[in-house]
């Protein structure tokens, strides 16, 4: 018997397209997502600013974003990597975000793909 989470995951599981991510990056829109992490922990709603779209070492399409609020195991606010195939629901909020240094000193202007060990190929960035 499927539990409610599995049913919702099956109904809502439309992986986000790279076009949707590009649109959010180009327009600097905050997004609301539900994310299915590896261990099915923290699958609730998250508020994220998407900054970079690219491929991981394993060849998965992913985006690097700054998560301000929402469900997470590692706490917020924090920079995180989100695989597109694990995004269960994607909703642009139309709230714009400012590109400025974050509390850890990382900023979109200073992003260096060579220092991001998670993304090996960058397709788009703020």
Describe every region a protein language model picked out:
Residues 2-16:
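Proteolytic processing junctions in secreted/extracellular precursors
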Residues 13-126:
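Core beta-strand-centered patch of the WYL/Sm-like small regulatory domain
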């Amino acid at each position: 018997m499927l539990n409610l989470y599995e049913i919702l995951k099956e109904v809502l599981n439309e992986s986000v397209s790279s076009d949707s991510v590009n649109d959010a990056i180009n327009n600097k829109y905050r997004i609301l997502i539900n994310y299915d992490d590896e261990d099915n922990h923290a699958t609730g709603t998250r508020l994220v600013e998407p900054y970079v779209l690219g491929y991981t070492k394993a060849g998965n399409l992913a985006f690097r974003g700054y998560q301000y609020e929402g469900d997470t195991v590692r706490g917020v606010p924090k920079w995180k990597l989100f695989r597109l195939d694990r995004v269960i629901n994607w909703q642009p909020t139309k709230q714009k975000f400012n590109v400025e240094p974050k509390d850890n000193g990382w900023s979109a202007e200073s992003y260096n793909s060579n220092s991001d060990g998670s993304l090996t190929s960058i397709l788009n960035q703020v």
